[in-house]
């Protein structure tokens, strides 16, 4: 049986998403399987992640699926895209989005000026390996590092302050998905700091290297603040654009663009 599903495609600085309203989906659908099929760039629509959202009384919930069908706990670029979509459809400028157990406050100042308060971060969680173990990993692969730091912003990140070649980032990103250090994998951020700007590329667990990562930008900014590498406000630079970061009362606030690409219909054969 073939089912027709309405979708929207958007991107945040090149990090692209297929977004579907849950009301358009049958309750019998395996959402992980659907997301994996939609995300395939050869046989589906193609995206880094698939977003399923639902409207509640005074907030929206969203579920994030990676290209391999696994779920993600947070995605800053996707939240900006969803906030813009809701703004375009309803005119709402102040929007609350719940991801997992975390409520995030979004404000759409203009179509391409969207801020998200992602709350505070943690540098001390049970999933984080000891500093000695992380540095032994770096020594094994002969990484020339300035510093490394684990950050939890609702999802797990390792920030590596170092200048590495693209092929090395791929190798390190893949190696760190093994269970040796991070039982559930980790998002690996490769950060270079210059003139209070963070030049960032991110290996996202379940997705690989992406053109941008909003939660990675927030985590890297928080790490840079803690280590004294940057001050607030700061800019995180990606290949397709920048995010403006600031800290207010312990909360990390991200501001940037979200771009509408298309609306369409996807034919899902169960």
From Swiss-Prot:
HAMAP family: DAP_epimerase. Its EC number is 5.1.1.7. It catalyses: (2S,6S)-2,6-diaminopimelate = meso-2,6-diaminopimelate. Catalyzes the stereoinversion of LL-2,6-diaminopimelate (L,L-DAP) to meso-diaminopimelate (meso-DAP), a precursor of L-lysine and an essential component of the bacterial peptidoglycan. It comes from the Bacteria. It is an enzyme of class 5 (isomerase). Pathway: Amino-acid biosynthesis; L-lysine biosynthesis via DAP pathway; DL-2,6-diaminopimelate from LL-2,6-diaminopimelate: step 1/1. Belongs to the diaminopimelate epimerase family. Homodimer. One of its GO terms (molecular function) is diaminopimelate epimerase activity. GO terms for cellular component: cytosol. It is found in: Cytoplasm. The active site is at 75 (proton donor), 213 (proton acceptor). Keywords: Amino-acid biosynthesis, Cytoplasm, Isomerase, Lysine biosynthesis. Substrate binds at residues 15, 49, 66, 76-77, 155, 187, 204-205, 214-215. It comes from Rickettsia prowazekii (strain Madrid E). One of its GO terms (biological process) is lysine biosynthetic process via diaminopimelate. Its main location: cytoplasm. This is Diaminopimelate epimerase.
